[in-house]
From Swiss-Prot:
PROSITE patterns from the UniProt entry: TRP_SYNTHASE_ALPHA
NCBIfam families: trpA
Enzyme class label: lyase
Protein name, UniProt field: Tryptophan synthase alpha chain
GN (gene name): trpA
Function as written in the Swiss-Prot or TrEMBL entry: The alpha subunit is responsible for the aldol cleavage of indoleglycerol phosphate to indole and glyceraldehyde 3-phosphate.
UniProt cross-references to PANTHER family, sorted A to Z: TRYPTOPHAN SYNTHASE ALPHA CHAIN, CHLOROPLASTIC, TRYPTOPHAN SYNTHASE, ALPHA CHAIN
Family from the record: Belongs to the TrpA family.
Lyase listed as a keyword: yes
Length: 268
C-alpha cells in the first residue's frame, strides 16, 4: 500500500498523471508475464494492474475473457500470479502492483492466507470486481492489517449513498469506470460526461481517482486524464499482446503500445 501512496504523491508533486496498464497474468504466455511487466515500466507505467485469470469474468468483455481463458489453459492460477509478482520484485522494488480479479479464488485460498501471501510476494493492492462495498468490511480489515490496499470501483450508475461509502473508505486509489458495461465494449468514450463525474469524485474522495474502460490509445488517455489523477488501459493492450507468441515480441509490443500514451500524458 505504501508504494501506491508514494507513487501518487510523487506524481502529484511533479504535476504528472499516473499511467496504469492492465495485463492478464499468463497471457500471451507464462514466460512473458514478468518480462512484459518490466517492459511496461520502461515505457512509462507508474502502476501495473495484473489480472488474475478467472473462469467467469463477468465484468470483462470478449478480449479479456479470451485472454483469461488462454491463461487458465496454461495453468495460470493464483499461485502462479503471486510467483510472478515475487519474480518481478527481484528487479523492481518500487513500482506498485495491483491484482485485479474476482472474489472466488481468494475465498477458496482463504482471505487472510491470501492477503499475507500477496504482501509477501510484493503485491500492493487488490481490486475485486464482484465484492460490493457494503460487504467488504471484513476483507478491508484483513487487508489493512497486512498492508494491502483494497481498491474500489465506481461507475456512472453508482448510487450517491454507495459513492459516499466508496469515497470515505478508498485506499490506494479509486477506480472510476468511465461507462457502464464490460471492459473493451465501447468504441465511443464520452469524455465530457466522465470528466464531470471525475471532478466530483476528486473533490469527495480521500484517495486519487483514476479512470478506466474505453481508453484505447494516446488520444483517449490524454483526454480522460485531464480531470483524473491517472488512467488505466487494459483491453487494447491485452489485444495487442495477444497477437504475439514469443517473449521478445511481447516485450517489444508492450513498450511500443504504452510509450505513446506516456508521451501524451506528459505533454497534456
Amino acid at each position: 500500500m505504501r508504494r501506491i501512496d508514494s507513487c501518487f504523491a510523487e506524481l502529484r508533486a511533479n504535476g504528472r498523471k499516473a499511467l496504469i496498464p492492465f495485463i492478464t497474468a499468463g497471457d500471451p504466455s507464462l514466460e512473458a508475464t514478468v518480462p512484459v511487466m518490466h517492459a511496461l515500466v520502461r515505457a512509462g507505467a507508474d502502476v501495473i494492474e495484473l489480472g488474475v485469470p478467472f473462469s467467469d469474468p463477468m465484468a470483462d468483455g470478449p478480449t479479456i475473457q479470451r485472454s483469461s481463458e488462454r491463461a487458465l489453459a496454461r495453468g495460470a492460477g493464483l499461485a502462479y500470479v503471486l510467483e510472478a509478482v515475487h519474480e518481478f520484485r527481484r528487479e523492481d522494488a518500487t513500482t506498485p502492483v495491483v491484482l485485479m480479479g474476482y472474489l472466488n479464488p481468494i475465498e477458496i485460498h482463504g482471505t487472510r492466507r491470501f492477503a499475507e501471501a500477496a504482501v509477501a510476494a510484493g503485491v500492493d493492492g487488490v481490486l475485486l470486481v464482484d465484492l460490493p462495498p457494503e460487504e467488504a468490511g471484513e476483507t478491508r480489515t484483513i487487508f489493512t492489517e497486512v498492508g494491502l490496499a483494497l481498491i474500489a470501483l465506481a461507475s456512472p450508475t453508482t448510487s450517491e449513498q454507495r459513492l459516499d461509502m466508496l469515497c470515505s473508505t478508498a485506499q490506494g486509489y479509486l477506480y472510476y469506470v468511465s461507462f457502464a458495461g464490460v471492459t473493451g465494449a465501447s468504441n465511443l468514450l464520452d469524455t465530457h460526461a466522465a470528466s464531470d463525474r471525475l471532478r466530483q469524485l476528486r473533490r469527495r474522495a480521500g484517495a486519487p481517482v483514476v479512470a478506466g474502460f474505453g481508453i484505447k490509445d494516446a488520444a483517449s488517455a490524454a483526454a480522460m486524464a485531464v480531470d483524473a489523477d491517472g488512467v488505466v488501459v487494459g483491453s487494447a493492450l491485452v489485444a495487442a499482446l495477444a497477437e504475439v507468441n514469443d517473449v521478445r515480441s511481447a516485450r517489444e509490443r508492450a513498450e511500443a503500445f504504452l510509450a505513446p500514451l506516456r508521451q501524451a500524458l506528459d505533454q497534456g
